[in-house]
Amino acid sequence: MIPSDMDLIESTAEQPDKLYNINRIRAFKDVPFLIRRTESKDTIVSYADAADEIQVLMNFLRKNGVPDEAGIALRVTEHTPASSLMILAILNNKCHFFPTDKMMLSQDLYSQMSTAGVDYLVANKHLTVAPLYFTFLGSILVFKEDCRLYRVKLKSADETVQSKKPLPANMCYTISTTGTTGKPKLIHVPYECIAPNIVGLSQKLNVSMADIIYLGTPITFDPFVVEFFLALQNGATLLTSRHSMRDSPSKVLSALFPDNLATPGITVLQMTPSLFRQFGASSIKDRVLSGSSSLRVLLLGGEPFPSNVELVTWMHPSVLMQKHICNIYGITEISCWSLLHIVQSLQSPVPLGTPIEEDTVLRIESEDNETSQQGELFLGSVKRRCYIPEVDDQANASQDDSGICFRATGDLVTRQQDGTLFYSERSNDVVKRAGNRISLGLITRKIQKCLPSSELTTCLWLEDLQKLICCIRTLESKTRVQQRVQTFDILSKVSIAEQPDRFVYLQHFPCNVHGKLDKQQLLKMCIPLAQPAQQILKSYLHDRLECVEEPDDSASKKQRLDDAAPCGYDLSFRQAGGTSFHAITICREIGLQMCIDDEQRHLFEMLLDENIPLRTVLRFLDTAKLVANNIKRKNVETAVVVSACQSGLIIKRIEQPVLKLQIYWKVNFEKCIDSPVTEYEGRFICVGAHSKILRTLNPQTGSEYSVVKLPERIECKVTFLTEQLAMVGCYDGCLYGFNPQTGNIVFRVGIGGLIKSQPMLTADGRRIIVCSYADDYNVYCLSAERQEVLWCLRIGEKPIFASPLELPREQSLIVCTLDGSYSRVAITDGSVEWTQKFREPVFSTPVLLESVSNIFLSAEVAGRVHACHVGNGKILATFSTEGNIFSSLVVKTPPTFMGHSFAIFGCIDQHLYCLRCKTGPGGKSVELELHWKVDVGAPIYATPTLLTVQPNGLLVWCAATDGRVMLINFRNGEIQWSDKLPGQVFSSACFIEDLRRVFVGCRDNFLYCLGI
């Protein structure tokens, strides 16, 4: 609908009253607008300072030709003073903003912006975009933070704006849904839609100038707008932290509720329940919801509200008299919240609440489209109308006779006689299982009642295998016997159709980027990886039926002779409690691995035959023809070898064996393993995890030599000094020396900042170099013998992530930092021999082009690989990719490629690159050319690993963030083998050639050993 002239006059008249208007902001004067909290200090921006900076940014936008009513996309790393002020400058420039995913590839970002009709983009810090799709217009420093402005290049015919109508007047922002209520949609939000929400919440929660609101919701999740605008509406203060809940809940807790009484804590906190739980019940009760905490309002939304049983573990009933604990509900389609309930009792069920604004209308529709007291909830409003092209441009858009526009929530609710609304479940959580319709939400609630208050459960449906999986989050690890007792108790309290096929125990549930329970990731963690058919049956028998494996075969034989009644694997499947329903489930899963359909049918018949013991079934599975890893692979092209002999030319066709990796063992580290894996002389494997656990393992069996529990998480690669001494950096800012065989701590040295960079032992074995995130000195040199500090210095203005590169011949180091600085430093005394600077940060560890070379390679995060001279650091050649580079580079100089070296690295543009590097005479020049690149289907953060496997030759191991792992031919980039781990992979692998095994950490909490 095109607004009339009167509407335009009214909207212009209302402009000064908008909560983000610069004059309104300036009126709050010296009131703090934003506090940026770090461990060392608070950076405070007042409303007056904010107004001045907004004016500067508005001039910057106008100078670069940004017109009124333009859409400006935001590609920002996190909430910072600069990003907040840029949003306000965009709005005051009569434009609207469009938050985007910072991890999105440039091509996808270009496509999304084109669909949204957005022509401009602002990126901050190290984030960049490909020049193929975007034109750089200019940059500006905002509180020492670089902000760059781009414009999309001319759109192709394939990229069309989605909306068929003009955008609403007074546009405020455009945002994409997460897909919770269906596939992701673009939502265009005018000011008139969000403003009443902010005014209503301000009144109901009594928000005032005295409040401090945590700005912690990601910019791509629309509740962040509520946090942001609540402060502007009331002159309250926003608080941001350098840490996130995904990074370190404990550090976020310390930032929000500091121990120092002189430092103010927050008063308003908005989170999803899943994210809030990550604080831990004890911290929630003692610090967040204690009577003495600064918190005044807690808003939990985006997911089902916690149960009364869980609430009791979080707070004393008296807290409800002091604080507003709120269930807040809404959908992005009516931005942002619609219903609010302030909890009055810890014993009563918590409803969805009542409308925040008076004009919000509720409607419940059942399956037959009749208005009912049970069914799907629809939210409607006369005033609060977002424009959703995908929906509103359809002829049958949902609107009743009164002009109210209704939006589906995708949630099933129940309305009681007094009008109170209660959440039931998601509408797509009802699935069909063996002819029965089952409700995942109902089953979850039934199982939750069987669990202690400290445990949490959710049920998942694996469509491909038609399997019901019950995930149980337990903070304390359980023995198999304890798990078995609990699962049988659960099975006795649900119907056969509701009984889970598998129970999975985890110590934490993963969250997506918006803080909601990530069910897709949870499913990946639960699906067994390449599990042998026998093990599938054994696991099912153990988890679901009354049959356990006999540990002592001789004892079982004696028992069978002494006792006529069969037991254990002498039982038939039916005697063990199996039904045809169970048999179908097992055959469906095992059948995916069977090559012959008749064998799958025969397995089903054996399971239902009461005269066939399980022992016989297991023997049959041992002989059945199975497809390894359930992946069909292309045949590897055969190599042709030509040779000569006395009788003439003979051509032999030699077929290289098809590569196949299988899992030999895996070890649970309880939390993510992002650290690179280290091996020592083929005898030890060592790695640390987010769980603070550091393990040294036997590479052949996975058995544990030692375990060390450090105070904080570990993302640093272990360095071995000897077989009895290794060292590792920790998030607590200390370097630890430990005995890998016993686990005893040998030394502990405080460095002053978290350590992600691998500590380096110099070639002469006399010094240890440690690079860190410390604020004062980010490079330390210690004596290897006594760990005394020999020298320390600071390079650049930012921390150091990359490991240093040693130049043994020059007795120097190359050190790269996160502000782009890179320096050559003398090992003997720490003197800086030269310093240069790239435009962007460096996460990638530099590497020499050859073992003895005048050239080293280094990669900027912005996607540029540079060849630099060792003598002065000057750039000799550059190769550019279209994505960020976090992977380190691996260099190889094969004897068959005379005069060439090859550099291999991963990129978040989903490609693995191999560059051909040719040096000129005297090593004074170099050429970098693309040798090959491979699309692996997902971003790559982990450093690739080179493997020599005979007779296949040199291979490249590559792991992507979605769990894909693959082996690639070094010569031509052809994929020789691929599979997928259950979780994301950020860990760099190691390879022991004699054992032909690869060791890699995964975000499903396991360290995997895969054998070739």
Curated annotation (Swiss-Prot):
<dbReference type="InterPro" id="IPR045851">
    <property type="entry name" value="AMP-bd_C_sf"/>
</dbReference>
<dbReference type="InterPro" id="IPR015943">
    <property type="entry name" value="WD40/YVTN_repeat-like_dom_sf"/>
</dbReference>
<dbReference type="InterPro" id="IPR011047">
    <property type="entry name" value="Quinoprotein_ADH-like_sf"/>
</dbReference>
<keyword id="KW-0276">Fatty acid metabolism</keyword>
<keyword id="KW-0547">Nucleotide-binding</keyword>
<feature type="binding site">
    <location>
        <position position="516"/>
    </location>
    <ligand>
        <name>ATP</name>
    </ligand>
</feature>
<dbReference type="Pfam" id="PF13570">
    <property type="entry name" value="Beta-prop_ACSF4"/>
</dbReference>
<keyword id="KW-0067">ATP-binding</keyword>
<comment type="function">
    <text>Covalently binds beta-alanine in an ATP-dependent manner to form a thioester bond with its phosphopantetheine group and transfers it to an, as yet, unknown acceptor. May be required for a post-translational protein modification or for post-transcriptional modification of an RNA.</text>
</comment>
<feature type="binding site">
    <location>
        <position position="411"/>
    </location>
    <ligand>
        <name>ATP</name>
    </ligand>
</feature>
<dbReference type="InterPro" id="IPR002372">
    <property type="entry name" value="PQQ_rpt_dom"/>
</dbReference>
<feature type="binding site">
    <location>
        <position position="426"/>
    </location>
    <ligand>
        <name>ATP</name>
    </ligand>
</feature>
<dbReference type="InterPro" id="IPR018391">
    <property type="entry name" value="PQQ_b-propeller_rpt"/>
</dbReference>
<dbReference type="GO" id="GO:0006631">
    <property type="term" value="P:fatty acid metabolic process"/>
</dbReference>
<comment type="similarity">
    <text>Belongs to the ATP-dependent AMP-binding enzyme family.</text>
</comment>
<dbReference type="Pfam" id="PF00501">
    <property type="entry name" value="AMP-binding"/>
</dbReference>
<keyword id="KW-0443">Lipid metabolism</keyword>
<dbReference type="InterPro" id="IPR052091">
    <property type="entry name" value="Beta-ala_Activ/Resist"/>
</dbReference>
<feature type="binding site">
    <location>
        <begin position="177"/>
        <end position="185"/>
    </location>
    <ligand>
        <name>ATP</name>
    </ligand>
</feature>
<keyword id="KW-0436">Ligase</keyword>
<dbReference type="GO" id="GO:0043041">
    <property type="term" value="P:amino acid activation for nonribosomal peptide biosynthetic process"/>
</dbReference>
<dbReference type="InterPro" id="IPR048005">
    <property type="entry name" value="AASDH_AMP"/>
</dbReference>
<dbReference type="InterPro" id="IPR000873">
    <property type="entry name" value="AMP-dep_synth/lig_dom"/>
</dbReference>
<dbReference type="InterPro" id="IPR042099">
    <property type="entry name" value="ANL_N_sf"/>
</dbReference>
<dbReference type="GO" id="GO:0005524">
    <property type="term" value="F:ATP binding"/>
</dbReference>
<dbReference type="GO" id="GO:0003833">
    <property type="term" value="F:beta-alanyl amine synthase activity"/>
</dbReference>
<protein>
    <recommendedName>
        <fullName>Beta-alanine-activating enzyme</fullName>
        <ecNumber>6.2.1.-</ecNumber>
    </recommendedName>
</protein>
